[in-house]
Structure formats: C-alpha cells, structure tokens
Curated annotation (Swiss-Prot):
Record protein name field: 2-methylisoborneol synthase
Positions of the UniProt region annotated as Disordered: 32-125
InterPro entries from the UniProt entry: Isoprenoid_synthase_dom_sf, MIB_synthase, Terpene_cyclase-like_2
The organism's taxonomic lineage, starting at the top: Bacteria, Bacillati, Actinomycetota, Actinomycetes, Kitasatosporales
Remaining remarks: 2-MIB is a volatile organic compound that has an unusually low odor threshold. Together with geosmin, methylisoborneol is responsible for the characteristic smell of moist soil as well as unpleasant taste and odor episodes associated with public water supplies and contamination of various foodstuffs, including fish, wine, and beer.
Length: 437
C-alpha cells in the first residue's frame, strides 16, 4: 500500500512539556514510524543520490564494482539494546536495568594490539572484510582523483590510518557501502584539516582562526554580494583541507535531510572552536587546569562522527528529539569518553613527536604533580567514569523514550563508541601502549 503523506513539519515535543509524557511519546512514535517508512525503515535506508557533479580534480577514477556489499547480519533489536539497557550504575538506577548484563565475547580472530589494562570497553567482532576492502579502495580513489588530498610521500600514512576498517567498524548498521562512504569522506577531511592546519603537516596555532573559518565555509556556504561570490568559490579549491571538506559535504547533503546537514555544520563549528582553545594554549605555552582541558575536549572531540549515525544508517532522528537535553547529554558523554580513548592510545606517539602535545595524562601530571604512570592510570579511571555515565544516561533515555528512531540512534552511538575503541586498540601502525603495567 502507498506510504502515507507526512504531516506538515511541527515540533513533536510542545514547549510546555518538560519531560517525556505518555501522550507526547505516542505522537512522536507515530511520526517517527511514518518517517522511517518514508526513508525505507531500519533495514533499508533512504536511497542515495548520484555523486555531486563538477568535483573532479584529476583523471576519472576506474569504474567501481557493484555497491551492494550487504550489511553483516545483525541480531534483533532486543540484543542490540541489551548493552544500553543494562548500563546504569549508582544509586537509584536499578530500575533501569531492564535486561541482564552480558558481555560480548572477544572474537577469536581479533587483530593484533592489546587493550589498555583496566580500560572499560566492549569487545566487538572484526569489521566485515568485504566492506573494509571496498571502502578502502573507494576512499583512496576519492582522495587522489577527486580532491588531490596528499602528495605521494604521505601515502604510507594514509594507508596506515586504515580509515576503511575504522568506519566499517563504527557503523555496523550502514545499509550500503555508499552510506559508509558518507562517514569515511568526512573522517578523512576532518583529519586533513587537523593535520594540515593544526598539527603534523605544516599546522600552526598562528593564524589558525582564519584558516578554520574559511574552511568552515566549505561546510556552511557563504551567501554574499555577486561581485565577491566567485572569489569565495575559487577559495574552496585552494588547499587539500578545503577541497576535502567541500567534496565530503556535497556528498553528505545529497543523502541527509536538512536538519541532519545542519546538525553536522553545528558539530563541526564546535570542533573548530575546540581547536582554537588548544591553539591559544600552545601560543601561550600554557598547560590548562584539568577541568579546562576537559571542557576543551567536549568541543575538540569526535562528536561530529557518532552524531551522523542516523544518516549513515539511512534513517533520521527528528531534530526536536536530537535537541532534547537528555539526548545532548548522552552524545556529550559518549564523545568525551571516546576522545579520552584517543588521548590514551596516542600517548606514546605524541610523546615521541616534537614539541609538547596536550593530552589528559600530560595535563594531569603537570597540574596535579603526579608521575607519568599515575597520571595515565588516573586518566583511565576518568574515562571509565564517563563511559559508565554514558551508559546510564543512555539506558535512562531509552527507557523513557521508546521511540524507534531514538532507540536506533542510541544503539548507533554505542556502536560508534565500541568501534572507535576497537580501531585504536588494533591499529598498531599508529599506536602503542606505554610500559606502565
């Protein structure tokens, strides 16, 4: 039967409602059900449009093989939700433990690399190899042929990044490789900006604000007088980070709904704001207080990655549900925890690099007078506290708001958190652990 036409846009959570009431949830659930039917439901995903025109910066890439690398078979919703719904910790949360907690077994074929001792995490299966190979092939073709991302001497680092394995592991519910490529292009573009503007490959805190603002216009277009529009348009081709941002965003907006695209723009602005705080400390040769560092890390973190889980999954979390304070808290806790994972796994890499690199163990050691080992182990404890808080808040939200798109979004964020840890643990090209145990 034909899909019913959606009603005109309106808030599904009236202003006067300060908590999730039963009547509101019923209306939101109905609307979310209609929305999922329109975009193809949880398993299908909305079809992706053709690639954007006019983005080629080199010879055409070879013909791609069929895009329908199937998603690995996933367990039912009850199993998927088990991790979140058994997550609460602390007084007063026992009633939210809706299913018995069960740790997934460590896969027998786990890649090399060991987890940080004592770090709270959930082992995950190895990413689907067919998808990893196809995403890896396509992202390299995009980087070289469409955006001229890097010179030949950086190829080993690009390959060592293993971004295909990273994104396949973080988005297990993506219906197609095309959907996975949305996340993969953005991840590569974000790292190009970080490396070329902020860190390894010519980055500097001097003038960073100007570079980031102009690059951000590749995500959030400039609308100005006709006389000056061509100059701005030409600037989007000026360097690899802007070319990558422009192309990745053009692909993304053709697959995402307007509110999903706007969500990403705002999350990227948050990221850039965090870059600027860290740059200011570098210019002043200042080590911030621990709480100041953690505040910066709530902005300079992975947030733009898990919050596109619905677009990559082929569905949409309504904007008013995404904006709820409870959802924002869950997203912030997940993003903060995953970023400390990066601080911990990249610790030895950053110590070996020229200059002083701020990370949580370094800041704690400096500000609290602890040994390097004690500061590192305290950072592990902080990560674990944030992870438990994330799971508790996610479980509470899942129980309070049984809307399909909310449940699936929470599962997607949790999957991203787990996949992010798995990639850091297994990527021994980039990361090794300190000798603290």
């Amino acid at each position: 039967m034909p899909v019913p036409e959606l009603p005109p846009p309106r808030s599904s959570l009236p202003e006067a409602v300060t908590r999730f009431g039963a009547s509101v949830l019923g209306a939101v659930a109905a609307r979310a059900h209609d929305s999922e039917a329109t975009v193809g439901g949880p398993s299908g995903g909305r079809p992706l449009p053709s690639p954007p025109a006019g983005l080629s910066f080199g010879p055409p890439s070879p013909a791609a093989p069929p895009t329908d690398v199937p998603a690995p078979e996933a367990p039912g919703w009850g199993a998927d939700l088990e991790r979140l719904l058994c997550g609460p910790h602390g007084l007063g949360t026992a009633g939210l433990r809706l299913t018995p907690g069960k740790e997934r077994p460590v896969p027998a074929t786990a890649r090399e690399g060991r987890p940080i001792p004592g770090l709270y995490h959930h082992p995950v299966p190895e990413p689907d190899e067919a998808r990893v190979e196809e995403v890896s092939r396509r992202i390299k073709a995009w980087a070289l042929d469409e955006v001229s991302l890097y010179p030949e001497e950086w190829e080993e680092q690009f390959d060592g990044f293993s971004v295909g394995r990273y994104m396949v592991g973080c988005h297990p519910d993506a219906p197609t490789v095309d959907h996975l490529m949305l996340a993969t292009r953005l991840m590569v573009a974000e790292n190009a900006v970080d490396d070329c503007y902020c860190e390894d490959h010519g980055g500097s805190p001097v003038g960073l604000g100007e570079r980031l603002l102009l690059a951000h216009t590749a995500l959030d277009p400039l609308y100005t007088a006709r006389e000056y529009q061509p100059g701005w348009a030409a600037s989007l081709h000026a360097d690899a980070p802007r070319r990558a941002y422009r192309s990745a965003m053009d692909y993304f907006v053709r697959a995402a709904g307007p509110s999903q695209a706007d969500r990403l723009r705002h999350d990227m602005a948050r990221l850039h704001l965090g870059y600027l705080a860290e740059a200011a400390w570098a210019q002043q040769d200042q080590v911030p207080e621990v709480w100041e560092y953690l505040a910066m890390r709530q902005f300079n973190n992975f947030r733009p990655c898990p919050t596109i889980t619905d677009t990559v999954g082929g569905y949409e979390l309504p904007a008013d549900l995404h904006a709820q304070a409870a959802m924002q808290k869950v997203i912030a806790l997940a993003s903060n925890a995953t970023t400390i994972v990066n601080d911990l796994y990249s610790y030895t890499k950053e110590l070996a690099a020229p200059g002083r690199h701020l990370n949580l163990p370094v800041v704690i050691a400096e500000r609290e007078g602890l040994s390097d080992q004690d500061a590192y182990l305290k950072s592990v404890e902080i990560h674990n506290e944030l992870m438990h808080a994330f799971e508790s808040e996610a479980a509470a939200l899942a129980a309070a708001c049984p809307v399909p798109s909310v449940q699936r979004f929470l599962r997607g964020v949790a999957a991203w958190v787990d996949g992010n840890h798995h990639w850091h643990r297994s990527n021994t090209y980039r990361y090794s652990l300190p000798d603290f145990w």
